[in-house]
């Protein structure tokens, strides 16, 4: 299961950087002005990635030229090419565009672990208490030596791409946008539920990613949150299109959560929302009545503060390379760098976990799940369950209540619900809103600067709204 989760991280973060975020910084059309020989020299100076010849980059340039000449920009449509906020030289733009295309192809390799263990990607199959793939070296339909070899090759290729493409590209692009090392912070409060248990979910001390609450940037004081604390873990709907029986100022723990629609917004078409009223389909999750940021930056800070040496070394290396102070991590650029840092940590972790799996199989332990709770007859008449993980976008929790064998309540609090939440009963804004305070636009009707910060969170509005 840890291998499947780690694979999702590496896949998701690489795809996010190149296909959902990089083009906020990279001007694709400007890459046509590049000298492929100079791009080749840049590539060879930053990593040993084999696709580095002038001819290779010339071919990429021809592909882009063909798209532009067609008059239909295809995958590169709906952008602000030529915007004055783009600062990369043409040669770095060409480098990034080449890797954008390579990352599309790399997905075929990245997803093999999900396909083998979980049957498909996206949305691989899990089972309660483990994973569905049996282990049998002598079976063609189970996890055997051939499939283990495919998994090992996939891990090696992911590590190579992260080491030789993703991280070098981050460090090649970031120096041109150092002003974003002091923009886009937001809240300064961070939350993680923790991830990658070494033994079981109850022993949080063995998690690779600690369960942590960090308040006001204070890395010297880490609190371990209890997701089932009815006093601290609450959702509010003061500015959401829902209503609670206890009124708009009430906060409810997810076990007692209510989802009753109360749309009071304007009828389309409209140009703006009345933010002093209800204005969002998202609820407002709060920890101790405080808005929190979740996601890669929260996890990197938790690991850094918790003494995880590789995270500390990587973070310090990035800051030193960019000539930035530690405070720079609390920013749009810091959030983007954190995603790369944890991708490197989790890619390396996959190799260690794979080796541990091999040792476990050799010892004769081939169990892949615990089915003790599968029979509903073993359940009490009233039961409450909490499932959690650190999804790539951040802390994810599902709370369910079961009465007489049937679900009587089910509430989800997902990463984007935390980050994109509207104001709460105390008029406290969520992470997205706060991160945009002070943002200035070079071209008001082309809000590239806003996209850079919002995309640094990796939004998923479809995940965040539950109707």
Where are the predicted features?
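Active-site bordering "gate/hinge" segments
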Residues: 1-393, 404, 409, 414-467
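A translation/RNA-centric and nucleic-acid-associated enzymatic feature enriched
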Residues: 398, 403
């Amino acid at each position: 299961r840890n291998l499947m989760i780690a694979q999702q991280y590496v896949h998701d973060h690489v795809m996010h950087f190149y296909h959902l975020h990089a083009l906020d910084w990279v001007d694709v059309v400007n890459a046509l002005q590049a000298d492929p020989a100079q791009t080749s020299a840049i590539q060879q100076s930053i990593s040993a990635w084999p696709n580095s010849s002038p001819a290779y980059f010339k071919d990429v340039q021809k592909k882009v030229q063909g798209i532009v000449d067609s008059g239909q920009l295809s995958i590169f449509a709906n952008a602000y090419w030529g915007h004055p906020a783009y600062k990369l030289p043409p040669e770095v733009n060409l480098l990034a565009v080449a890797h954008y295309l390579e990352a599309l192809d790399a997905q075929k390799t990245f997803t093999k672990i999900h396909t083998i263990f979980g049957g498909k990607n996206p949305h691989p199959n899990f089972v309660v208490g483990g994973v569905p793939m049996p282990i049998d070296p002598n079976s063609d339909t189970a996890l055997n030596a051939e499939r283990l070899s495919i998994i090992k090759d996939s891990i090696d290729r992911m590590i190579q791409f992260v080491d030789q493409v993703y991280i070098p590209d981050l460090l090649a692009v970031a120096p041109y946008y150092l002003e974003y090392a002091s923009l886009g912070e937001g809240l300064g409060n961070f939350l993680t539920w923790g991830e990658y248990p070494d033994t079981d979910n109850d022993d949080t001390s063995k998690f690779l990613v600690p369960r942590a609450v960090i308040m006001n940037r204070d890395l010297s004081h880490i609190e371990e949150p209890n997701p089932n604390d009815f006093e601290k873990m609450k959702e509010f709907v003061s500015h959401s299109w829902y209503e609670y029986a206890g009124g708009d100022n009430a906060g409810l723990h997810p076990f007692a959560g209510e989802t009753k629609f109360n749309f009071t917004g304007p009828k389309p078409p409209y140009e703006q929302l009345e933010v002093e009223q209800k204005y969002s389909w998202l609820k407002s999750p709060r920890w101790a009545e405080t808005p929190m940021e979740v996601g890669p930056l929260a996890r990197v800070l938790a690991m850094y503060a918790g003494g995880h040496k590789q995270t500390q070394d990587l973070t310090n290396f990035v800051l030193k390379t960019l000539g930035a102070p530690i405070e720079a991590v609390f920013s749009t650029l810091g959030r983007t760098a954190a995603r790369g840092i944890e991708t490197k940590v989790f890619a390396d972790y996959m190799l260690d976990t794979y080796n541990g799996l091999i040792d476990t199989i050799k010892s004769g332990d081939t169990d892949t799940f615990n089915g003790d709770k599968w029979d509903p007859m073993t359940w009490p008449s009233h039961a409450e369950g909490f499932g959690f993980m650190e999804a790539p976008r951040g802390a994810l929790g599902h709370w369910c209540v079961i009465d007489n064998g049937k679900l009587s309540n089910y509430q989800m609090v997902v990463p984007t619900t935390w980050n994109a939440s509207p104001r709460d009963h105390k008029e406290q804004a969520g992470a997205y809103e706060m991160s945009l305070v002070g943002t200035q636009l070079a071209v008001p009707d082309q809000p590239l600067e806003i996209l850079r910060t919002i995309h640094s969170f990796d939004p998923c509005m479809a995940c965040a709204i539950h109707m």
